[in-house]
């Protein structure tokens, strides 16, 4: 792909992702309203569809006033660090054969690295705010990411072993014409989904911004577009986790009749709907229960799944 085509595709992808994140906020609020038997946004545009545009314009016009005594460098850097790595992560996602900005040999590891950077944004924002509630939220985020990133990587290694590659396109190609890896790796898929919820900081793994005891957690002192960038990063993280889950376990772009990018988009949308459904259905656990589950239950299961898969892969190769 020439440099001009890469630049053009990158621009189109950027605009599509920003639009998808905005539409997702509207879809989430409408779906939550339906699940909770109440009205969602229904004033701006048909079915409230333009509510996300109105919210964006409102945040653009709001003042962004740092608190007194804030570390301005950390305070300003944190929102950008929450959003931009998520955009970079989509640079290695293969939406269809040859429809990828950069099909890296270590594409899966690159996406994991981008997801892990979000915890730096949360800790920097908490530290820069000089706020006790924000600092507690940042510390929770750091401990949670350390616990859940450990088995996030282990849970996807089964797919890497079966495909024999970290490249996104190779993993999808290994599932074409055969069984999707969600059927061969059901435990790995379940563990990866749970870890993905934690990586995206979604309920029930959103204790770093728990409103009941931390006001707004690490975002307590943010407003205006800085606040919006944190939310943009969160929704892009959901889409990135859904895209990675689709690639690893749902065959990527594979599907009958419809074009590959359409199948990929439908699968990502379905996974994103499950994220919203879980937000409406599940309570928030205690912090000690959350961390204990990661270290005592999920991590041993991920190791067991990896060992069994490695044994099967070696047996097939022999």
UniProtKB/Swiss-Prot annotation:
Compartments in which it is found: Cell inner membrane
Keywords, sorted A to Z: Cell inner membrane, Cell membrane, Membrane, NAD, Quinone, Translocase, Transmembrane, Transmembrane helix, Ubiquinone
Topology in the lipid bilayer: Multi-pass membrane protein
A GO-annotated cellular component: plasma membrane
GO-annotated biological processes: aerobic respiration
UniProt GO molecular function: NADH dehydrogenase activity; oxidoreductase activity, acting on NAD(P)H, quinone or similar compound as acceptor; quinone binding
Keyword NAD on entry: yes
A Pfam family annotated for this UniProt entry: NADHdh
EC number(s) per entry: 7.1.1.-
Superkingdom of this protein's organism: Bacteria
InterPro entries: NADH_UbQ_OxRdtase_su1/FPO
PANTHER family: NADH DEHYDROGENASE SUBUNIT 1, NADH-UBIQUINONE OXIDOREDUCTASE CHAIN 1
Similarity field: Belongs to the complex I subunit 1 family.
Record text on subunit structure and interactions: NDH-1 is composed of 14 different subunits. Subunits NuoA, H, J, K, L, M, N constitute the membrane sector of the complex.
Protein name, per record: NADH-quinone oxidoreductase subunit H 2
């Amino acid at each position: 792909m020439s440099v001009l085509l890469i630049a053009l595709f990158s621009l189109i992808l950027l605009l599509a992702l920003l639009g998808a994140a905005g539409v997702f906020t509207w879809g989430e609020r409408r779906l939550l309203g339906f699940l909770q038997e109440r009205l969602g946004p229904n004033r701006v545009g048909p079915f409230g569809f333009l509510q996300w545009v109105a919210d964006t314009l409102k945040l653009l016009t709001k003042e962004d006033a740092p608190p007194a005594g804030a570390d301005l460098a950390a305070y300003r850097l944190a929102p950008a660090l929450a959003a931009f790595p998520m955009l970079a992560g989509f640079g290695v996602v293969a939406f269809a054969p040859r429809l990828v900005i950069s099909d890296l040999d270590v594409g899966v590891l690159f996406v994991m690295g981008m997801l892990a950077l979000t915890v730096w944004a949360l800790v920097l924002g908490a530290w820069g705010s000089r706020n006790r509630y924000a600092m507690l939220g940042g510390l929770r985020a750091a401990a949670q990411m350390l616990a859940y990133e450990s088995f996030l990587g282990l849970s996807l290694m089964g797919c890497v072993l079966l495909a024999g590659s970290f490249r996104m396109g190779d993993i999808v190609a290994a599932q074409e014409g055969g069984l999707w890896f969600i059927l061969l790796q059901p435990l790995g898929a379940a563990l990866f989904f749970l870890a993905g919820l934690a990586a995206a900081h979604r309920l029930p793994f959103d204790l770093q911004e728990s409103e009941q005891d931390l006001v707004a957690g690490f975002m307590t002192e943010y407003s205006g577009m800085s606040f919006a960038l944190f939310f943009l990063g969160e929704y892009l993280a959901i889409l990135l986790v859904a895209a990675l889950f689709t690639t690893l376990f749902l065959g990527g772009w594979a599907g009958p009749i419809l074009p590959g990018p359409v199948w990929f988009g439908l699968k990502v949308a379905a996974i994103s709907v499950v994220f919203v459904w879980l937000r409406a259905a599940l309570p928030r656990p205690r912090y000690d229960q959350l961390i204990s589950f990661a270290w005592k239950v999920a991590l041993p299961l991920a190791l067991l799944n990896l060992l069994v898969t490695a044994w099967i892969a070696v047996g097939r190769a022999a």
